[in-house]
Amino acid sequence: MTVTDEMTAEVFISRMYDTYGDVFNWWIPPETKTFINELVTELGADDSFVLNRSISLEAKCESCDDMLFCSVGADGSGLWRIYHLTWSHCRERGGFPRRTDLPGRKAALEYIRDNFEEEYL
């Protein structure tokens, strides 16, 4: 499946389900506040992904609990990262939570697609 610049995570997930059915393991949680709160707790409020930015949870992997977050600054700049939260309910150190930095939404969705196809097909 081709990912376009305009494609939202919701459209991407819908098309991946159309292509792969229930084997596709990413979804959009109806409630995201718990996940965002845990991310902020683990990173710390002074982290550059959090500080003066609006955070959204774009998608979650059911199989491995990875989550795609977008963080938007006041200037409209977006940071895209996949995080694997530890659920420690405290600030983490030493490379945790584990993360993958991505240059934008399209790259993030392509990363999810490519990893899914490599690991699950």
What does each model-found stretch correspond to?
Residues 2-54:
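Negatively charged, low-complexity tracts enriched in Asp/Glu with abundant Ser/Thr
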Residues 47-99:
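Amphipathic protein-protein interaction modules
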